[in-house]
């Protein structure tokens, strides 16, 4: 304990400028923090806006897919499977389209 007490006054003035240097770094950090916050806010806003655009695009793409009549898809599948026409007919009977147009047509 005595040795530590003897060292502390000798380290005291040495720690002083060290603490001041740390404070300067903290000051610089505080000076940069609002700029970083602004930059982060901009990037975050941009990312959020871009994310919203992606979401809307996905929704529009889904709506566009829904608007397409599945008959086109089925015709394409039938053309693709010309050899297996019977299997395609069975799949047509089993799988009915959920779109309103096909429901109205079937009912």
UniProtKB/Swiss-Prot annotation:
GO terms for molecular function: cadmium ion binding; DNA binding; zinc ion binding. The modification Phosphoserine is found at residues 8, 10, 33. Residues 43-94 have a biased composition (Basic residues). GO terms for biological process: chromosome condensation; nucleus organization; spermatid development; spermatogenesis. Keywords: Chromosome, Developmental protein, Differentiation, DNA condensation, DNA-binding, Nucleosome core, Nucleus, Phosphoprotein, Spermatogenesis. Residues 1-94 are annotated as: Disordered. This is Protamine-2. It is found in: Nucleus; Chromosome. Expressed in spermatids (at protein level). GO terms for cellular component: male germ cell nucleus; nucleoplasm; nucleosome; nucleus. Signal peptide: none annotated. Interacts with TDRP. Pfam families: Protamine_P2. The keyword rRNA-binding does not apply. PANTHER family: PROTAMINE-2. Disruption phenotype: Male mice are sterile due to reduced compaction of chromatin in sperm. Its main location: nucleus. Proteolytic processing into mature chains is required for histone eviction during spermatogenesis. Transition proteins (TNP1 and TNP2) are required for processing. Protamines substitute for histones in the chromatin of sperm during the haploid phase of spermatogenesis. They compact sperm DNA into a highly condensed, stable and inactive complex.
């Amino acid at each position: 304990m005595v040795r530590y007490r003897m060292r502390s006054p000798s380290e005291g003035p040495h720690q002083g400028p060290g603490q001041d240097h740390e404070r300067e770094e903290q000051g610089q950090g505080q000076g940069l923090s609002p700029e970083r916050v602004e930059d982060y806010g901009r990037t975050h806003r941009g990312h959020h806006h871009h994310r919203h655009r992606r979401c809307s695009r996905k929704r529009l793409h889904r709506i566009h897919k829904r608007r397409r009549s599945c008959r086109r898809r089925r015709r394409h599948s039938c053309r693709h499977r010309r050899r297996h026409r019977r299997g395609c007919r069975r799949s047509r009977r089993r799988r009915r389209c959920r779109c309103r147009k096909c429901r109205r047509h079937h009912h």
